[in-house]
């Protein structure tokens, strides 16, 4: 062997780039908050750290702070094989052209789906967030009973603190702000007759029970609630529906037809959706007028509207039909409609997309839906 031969040179290792995960958590959260939510399911598969951050409350708060949050539809259903209600959120597949599937043989592209909560698609059940003056109040709608209410000043994203607790622990609660007070109903044991419904006054920082609506409402499942002209209308799983008047602290039975027509307000225009028509209220002539351009939607959608919601500057509607061929299941349809005022007395609608978003057993119960920033 030649002693003069040069020893073999060690191969130089390429400079490894610093790991993204080596960055401080605050920076990671800030980066993730700038990415559209539709990409989160794939990102959560990268590693456990990403999955943990995507499910974290810190990311939710950061998206609100940066203004990158998106309006997301949340739906609550009672499924026959589940003891507790199940929450779902609407997920849109990224970089896809959404289509109108009404009248088509292929009923779903699966580009829009209702996915279970919690999951990488949507980490948590939506919260009630009510605004009173300069403060925001939050109450969880999770299936785990809790009496906690949170409050923070609107100018400080991170400074949530505990507000006075509700008198009883509630799960999947209904809550509304009316005339500067927070009204909560249900979510507790049916025998909690005194505190089945209560109201919080921010001025006195106290909770006060409302009049007992009676056992029939307390033991039933609430499947709809609406506020109109300062009154709370409650639709339950029985034949009767109820209305509560905060001014008189009084419950009354109301005609069920009030809850059949679903309404929402967009840019100071009230819209109404029923089994066979879509209309808007002309305040000048004090009459309801048909929304033009939606004849195909009205003709194909011959079933009851489940819910209507404001979806940004558009309107979102949900309805159900029996699924062929054996009709053992139901298909939940979702459509997003853009609205345009063309003349003084004309409003036109255009279906931006419509598709089946979930198939469920026919015996399921639709409880409610909400559009929340996430």
From Swiss-Prot:
Instruction: Give the InterPro entries listed for this entry.
Output: F-box-like_dom_sf, F-box/kelch-repeat_ARATH, F-box_dom, Kelch-typ_b-propeller
Signal peptide location:
none
Q: Where are the Kelch repeats?
A: 135-180, 181-227, 231-278, 280-308
Q: Which domain of life is it from?
A: Eukaryota
Domain F-box stretches:
17-63
Listed name of the protein? Putative F-box/kelch-repeat protein At4g39756
Keywords attached to this entry: Kelch repeat, Repeat
Q: Which Pfam families match?
A: F-box, Kelch_FKB95
């Amino acid at each position: 062997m030649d002693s003069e031969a040069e020893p073999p040179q060690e191969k130089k290792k390429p400079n490894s780039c610093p790991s993204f995960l080596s960055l401080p958590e605050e920076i990671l959260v800030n980066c993730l908050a700038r990415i559209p939510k539709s990409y989160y399911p794939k990102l959560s598969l990268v590693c456990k750290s990403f999955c943990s951050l995507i499910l974290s409350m810190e990311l939710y708060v950061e998206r609100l702070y940066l203004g990158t949050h998106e309006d997301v539809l949340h739906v609550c259903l009672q499924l026959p094989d589940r003891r507790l209600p199940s929450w779902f959120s609407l997920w849109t597949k990224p970089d896809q052209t959404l289509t109108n599937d009404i009248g088509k043989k292929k009923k779903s592209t699966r580009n829009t789906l209702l996915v279970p909560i919690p999951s990488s698609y949507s980490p948590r059940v939506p919260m009630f967030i009510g605004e009173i003056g300069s403060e925001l109040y939050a109450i969880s709608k999770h299936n785990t009973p809790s009496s906690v209410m949170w409050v923070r000043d609107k100018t400080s994203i991170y400074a949530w603190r505990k507000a006075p607790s509700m008198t009883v622990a509630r799960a999947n609660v209904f809550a509304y702000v009316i005339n500067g007070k927070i009204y909560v109903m249900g979510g507790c044991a049916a025998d909690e007759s005194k505190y089945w419904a209560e109201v919080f006054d921010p001025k006195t920082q106290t909770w006060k029970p409302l009049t007992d609506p009676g056992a029939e409402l307390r033991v039933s499942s609430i499947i709809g609630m609406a506020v109109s002209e300062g009154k709370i209308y409650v639709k339950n799983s029985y034949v009767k529906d109820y209305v509560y008047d905060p001014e008189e602290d009084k419950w009354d039975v109301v005609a069920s037809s009030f809850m059949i027509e679903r309404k929402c307000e967009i840019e100071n225009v009230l819209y109404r959706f029923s089994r066979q028509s879509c209309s808007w209220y002309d305040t000048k002539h004090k009459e309801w007028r048909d929304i033009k351009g939606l004849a195909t939607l009205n003709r194909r959608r011959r079933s009851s509207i489940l819910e209507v919601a404001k979806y940004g500057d558009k309107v979102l509607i949900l309805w159900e039909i029996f699924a062929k061929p054996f009709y053992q299941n139901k298909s939940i349809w979702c459509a997003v409609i853009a609205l345009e005022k063309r003349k003084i007395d004309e409003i036109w609608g255009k279906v931006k997309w419509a598709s089946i978003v979930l198939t469920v057993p026919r015996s399921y119960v639709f409880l409610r839906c909400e559009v929340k920033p996430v």
